[in-house]
Amino acid sequence: FVHWGGTPVDLDGIKEVVELAYERFGFRPMVIEDAAHAIGAEWKGRRIGSLESGNICVFSTQAIKHLTTGDGGIITLPNKELYKRCKLLRWYGIDRDKRNYQGKDFRLESDVTEYGFKMHMNDLSATLGLANLPHLDRILAGHRANAEFYNKALQGVNGVTLLEPPEGGLSSYWIYTFHVQNKMDFIAF
């Protein structure tokens, strides 16, 4: 599911669905939270991706996001097994722990255990992200202040419906989203 525009979904509702699946089918499906827009968003006082949910959570740190590394992202994982698997897949499936440099065994089959991808962050991008991290709360406060301005300005405008986060949710407002009944009338307004 997607925390669209930085607005968190009802995580309690998602948890209910997971528990219902367990009751009916005997397993708890793994949930992946698409939090590309939602770094700094909160559900019931806890930041999205804090692992309280037990879900996999992915964030974007692309150039125009709240926290940027130029490009790339962050993944939070609920257990060590998934961490090891993601670490393996991020660099072509190379298992660096299986390399045998002492015995000079540099054969490909000795360290590539499965096909992977090139999805690791380089040091320069990571440094950029770490340098931006202390500014995240200030950036979030600015986006939330802008959203409050829009809420006041659009309150009561005919044909406009403001979209509020679900009760217990605090949006990061990467995107300010609202609904208009008639787009052309709104543009003319």
Report residues per predicted region.
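Active-site phosphate-binding strand-loop segment of PLP-dependent enzymes
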Residues: 1-69, 74-82
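PLP-dependent aminotransferase class I/II
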Residues: 1-2, 7-16, 20, 24-26, ...
